[in-house]
Amino acid sequence: VACRGSKSDSVTPNSVMVRRETTHGSASIPPVVVGGIMIFLQREGRTIRELSYSFEADGYIAPDLTILAEHLTLSNSITEWAYQQSPDSVIWMVRDDGLLIGLTYQREHEVVGFHKHVTEGKFRSVCTIPGPTQEELWTVVEREVDGITRKYIELMDNRFTGDSSEHAFFVDSGLTYDQEESDSVFTGLDHLEGKTVSVLADGAVRPDVVVRNGSITLAAPAKIVHAGLSYISNMKTLRLEGGSLNGGTAQGRKKRISHVTVRLFQSL
């Protein structure tokens, strides 16, 4: 929909012009604009497309982005999404089964990458708001705690950029305790009653403990403690392509990996 005339002209039935730019219908979820490109969800809620101008076609095109990760929306649809501009330009999406999907999108650098996030519960809603150092991602998570299903409003912690493991927060629905005196009993975990939580105390990993009466007890006292639900981070590489002795591809051939070199970025 476009309006003819200058910015100061009034909107009238004669000044409004409707022009179809793509044949792909959109869902009821409002689109997001990233770097001048509009990202919208197709009518069935399973295909994400970008609407951008093509000089070759001399018009707008809407290529499919989910073709890079069709399995993420093959059987489930997107019910809600929100765009987090900083620090990494990510579109966060909630799937109808409670899974959280992220789309890292930086078209100027040709970066389009999907990633999924699983928690001990189900994501139901997501939104972003401005924060002091970056945009904050807030979610509504449905968890079953002590036999009762509850909905929690949770904030995704800022990306860890420190050089000390004492402030590394890598748990779900967790709390941080930072006090002057060491202690071994920490309260305030009523929202995780009966759950087994992971603990990082003064930069060291402690054995998992169970929340009882809203508190946990550590074997040794500590000052800075992070406690919450644990999660596992998995990375799956592409198939190794080592070439062939006779030329061509090595796909389908037997391989034996004898050495692996792992390069880490800003590891502790």
Map each language-model feature to its residues.
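Beta-sheet repeat architectures centered on beta-propellers
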Residues: 2, 8-27, 33-37, 42-268
